[in-house]
Amino acid sequence: MARISNVNVPTNKRVMIGLTYIYGIGRSTAQKICQEVQVSVNKKVKDLSNQELVALRSIIESKYKVEGDLRREINLNIKKKKDIRCYEGLRHIRKLPVRGQNTHSNARTRKGKAIAIAGKKKPNK
C-alpha cells in the first residue's frame, strides 16, 4: 500500500479513487492533483513510480489541508461559533440541524433517538 498523508492508499484502485481515501480530498480535488502531477487518473496506484508518489505527497502537503489539520480547523471553527453564541453556534450547542433544515418531523440523526414523553395514565377498567 502507498502511504500518502499518513493514510494507506489501496494499491489496486485507480489513482483518482485512491486519493479520495484521504480525508479532505474528493473526486474533483483528486483529479486536479493528478493533472498537476501529470499522472493519468486511470493509472493504478501500484503502477506509480517513486517520483510520482513523491510529487503527489509534496503537492498534497503544500497546497491542501487534509486529515488531522482539516479536522482540527473544522472543530476550532465550530468551537468559535459556539463561543460567540451566533445562531449556528447555538444550533450546535443544542445539537440541532445547523443549515435551516426542518425539525418538526425529521432530524432524527442530529437530535438522537426519540424520547417518549409520559402522558396521562389511562384509568384501569
From Swiss-Prot:
Recorded superkingdom: Bacteria
Entry's Gene Ontology BP terms: translation
Q: Which InterPro entries does this one have? A: Rbsml_uS13_C, Ribosomal_uS13, Ribosomal_uS13-like_H2TH, Ribosomal_uS13_bac-type, Ribosomal_uS13_CS
Q: What does this protein do?
A: Located at the top of the head of the 30S subunit, it contacts several helices of the 16S rRNA. In the 70S ribosome it contacts the 23S rRNA (bridge B1a) and protein L5 of the 50S subunit (bridge B1b), connecting the 2 subunits; these bridges are implicated in subunit movement. Contacts the tRNAs in the A and P-sites.
**Would you tell me the protein name for this molecule?**
Small ribosomal subunit protein uS13
One Pfam family recorded for the sequence: Ribosomal_S13
Q: Which GO terms describe its molecular function?
A: rRNA binding; structural constituent of ribosome; tRNA binding
- Organism for this UniProt entry: Orientia tsutsugamushi (strain Ikeda) (Rickettsia tsutsugamushi)
Similarity remark = Belongs to the universal ribosomal protein uS13 family.
| Annotated GO CC locations | cytosol; small ribosomal subunit
Which controlled-vocabulary keywords does the entry list? Ribonucleoprotein, Ribosomal protein, RNA-binding, rRNA-binding, tRNA-binding
Extract the NCBIfam families matched here.
uS13_bact
What are the top taxonomic ranks of the organism? Answer: Bacteria, Pseudomonadati, Pseudomonadota, Alphaproteobacteria, Rickettsiales
Provide the assembly information: Part of the 30S ribosomal subunit. Forms a loose heterodimer with protein S19. Forms two bridges to the 50S subunit in the 70S ribosome.
The primary gene name is rpsM
Cite the PROSITE patterns for this sequence: RIBOSOMAL_S13_1, RIBOSOMAL_S13_2
Query: Where does the chain cross the membrane?
Result: none
